[in-house]
């Protein structure tokens, strides 16, 4: 899987290492690479228990590409602890450091003005809004399972849904941005 590629940022991603691996496969006469599963992982980081069938794992977004796009600085990335061994996934480091960096990239991006973003949202209408809302709620409730959320939102009561959509609109937007970046790089 992508996550098992060597990386200086805690987990394999859509980085130059991925492209180098594809080149290696080609030189070896291989025409296929089993990259699945690509979904966003939850507690325990099992790729077989993703939060969504359609969403991509934000861990796979290449931070160096975000630097090239002017959304992050190399100093910001280097200030993070990514684990001691680039050949082993450092899930704790990835969780605690990657999301704050991705939030900075989101705040600096003008992606809403890109035609590609609007098209991505339109093409992904059948899953993106619900996924982004769910993830915003999950982080709002300290990553607790949905059964531990307040009853009104757990049962998707209209007033609660409307209230949380308004309260968490920036967070919802962040999760949409992550999916846009994932699919741009994928």
Predicted stretch roles:
Residues 1-186:
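Acidic/aromatic-lined carbohydrate-recognition and catalytic surfaces
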